[in-house]
Amino acid sequence: MRFDIEGFITFDTEEASLVNLLTGDCIELSATSTRLLTNLLQYRGDIISRVDIFQSVFEKYGARPSNSNLNQYISTLRRSLADLGIEKNVIITVPRIGFKISEEVIITSDNDYSSSFTLPVLTADLPQRSLLW
């Protein structure tokens, strides 16, 4: 799956990378960072609790979650996005609850492209002939 962030950063979940489309700069992400960012982007606008993140990003893959680990991964993602030129705070901390993607950030995904793009209907318009008799 691919997400575009602010129109110039692409996050490719298969490649586990963030790419600035304007400069070509690329940052490789760890598997855990990729799962975390994917989770946040898929539920953008919603607050994802720490407990849900622990389960879906860490425990499900055999890793032991902790608040310290999670905070470190969030910090790394924020730094990576800033290094690629995003000036907005993309990942918002909701104190004592969890995290969410800022509603001010423009995010599009593969699903958004496929559902919003439709091919135009083509009609066979034959040239009109006027007969002058």
Regions found by a protein language model. Give the residues of each.
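Short amphipathic alpha-helical recognition elements used for nucleic-acid or partner binding
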Residues: 26-57, 77
